[in-house]
């Protein structure tokens, strides 16, 4: 099992409310200030702001459309404006396969679209929050490793 090292610097982009997933999926430390501790140089991190801002991501990628064999290039819309994220659903194996956000609207749980794919036999975790309005979400690929970083901001 890989060792996990604490690397906290007030000037870094991580801060107290960060959650870093690394390959392989290591120990999760769940507390009010959710975080997984691992050393990653800040130069490998590029943040995508999601949550209440309703902006598009800035990274370009290729994904498969609903049509047979259609490949589409472009940005993904983060249309969560005005909603409070209450849950994050994470499917993982050796790496994180998908992330999906949940919102409470009129007492009912409403799910966002799934970001990523899921394979049969994947593990599944649900992270519940109260009053989370903004999430900074990052996906980095470096030397064959897939890194996911989520930074939470309470309202």
From Swiss-Prot:
Record's subcellular location: Membrane
Keyword terms, alphabetized: Lectin, Membrane, Transmembrane, Transmembrane helix
Membrane topology: Multi-pass membrane protein
One Gene Ontology molecular-function label: carbohydrate binding
Highest taxon in the source lineage: Eukaryota
Chief location: membrane
Gene Ontology cellular-component annotations: membrane
TM region positions: 26-48, 127-149
Positions of the Jacalin-type lectin domain: 47-155
Coiled coil: none
Keyword Aminoacyl-tRNA synthetase: no
PROSITE patterns: JACALIN_LECTIN
Sequence similarity: Belongs to the jacalin lectin family.
Protein name (database record): Probable jacalin-related lectin 26
Naturally occurring in which organism (per UniProt): Arabidopsis thaliana (Mouse-ear cress)
Source organism phylogeny: Eukaryota, Viridiplantae, Streptophyta, Embryophyta, Tracheophyta
